[in-house]
UniProtKB/Swiss-Prot annotation:
Sequence ranges assigned to domain LysM in this UniProt record: 59-103
Protein name, UniProt field: LysM and putative peptidoglycan-binding domain-containing protein 2
Region of interest: Disordered: 184-206
Composition bias, Basic and acidic residues: 186-197
The organism of origin for this protein: Xenopus laevis (African clawed frog)
InterPro entries xref list: LYSM1-4, LysM_dom, LysM_dom_sf
Length: 206
């Protein structure tokens, strides 16, 4: 009597998990779907993503007695939670125990060849912005002086009406004093002449 049981053939292309397969067509489709799912699609040219990668760098801020966490966050455009997370602060009062804080700043990093190369180096990730308190007013003062000097050179000098009126008033006052002095001298000379004439007339009559 012949044996009619199905013969299990070994899989020629590497086999399945146990080395044999009952449905080679279905297994090939499953392997194909798994391979397509695990394969990362690449995009080239204009089909690539235009969104630039974001990188987080830190700026060192030197603390002063008047600094507050809210003021620092508003100055750099970040949230207080980001500053706390970057410096591992548990409360806002802990900033007075430090000399400086690391401020997280998110910046776009330029890339070459779809992310294969980066223009920014890790050495440039941290930027030191600490400066002494005496240097900041000096820089601000020099900046204002330069602005004032440039404004003076670009614009003609125009005197205000108050200065002109004060100068005119002083000139008029000097002129009035001079005229009154001349008038007083003239009156005095006329009185002297009149007195001399009356004295001469009296002496002639006698």
């Amino acid at each position: 009597m012949a044996d009619l049981s199905p013969v299990i053939q070994p899989h020629r292309e590497g086999g399945s998990r146990y080395g044999y397969t009952m449905f080679p067509g279905l297994e090939s489709e499953a392997e194909l779907s798994l391979s397509l799912a695990s394969t990362k699609t690449r995009s080239y040219g204009s089909t690539g993503s235009v969104a630039a990668p974001l990188a987080e760098r830190y700026i060192e801020h030197c603390l002063s007695p008047s600094d507050t966490l809210q003021g620092i966050a508003l100055k750099y455009g970040v949230t207080m939670e980001q500053i706390k997370r970057a410096n591992k602060l548990f409360s806002t009062d802990c900033i007075f125990l430090r000399k400086s804080l690391n401020i997280p700043v998110i910046s776009k990093k330029g890339s070459l060849f779809n992310g294969l190369g980066s223009l920014d180096s890790p050495e440039n990730e941290t930027q030191d912005t600490c400066s002494s308190p005496t240097e900041e007013p000096a820089l601000a003062e020099s900046h204002t002086v330069s602005i004032d000097s440039s404004a003076k050179t670009n614009q003609p000098i125009v005197r205000s009406d108050e200065e002109l009126s004060a100068k005119d008033f002083l000139q008029r006052l000097d002129l009035q004093i001079k005229r009154s002095t001349q008038a007083a001298q003239r009156l005095k000379e006329e009185d002297d002449l009149r007195h001399d004439g009356s004295y001469a007339t009296c002496s002639y009559q006698h």
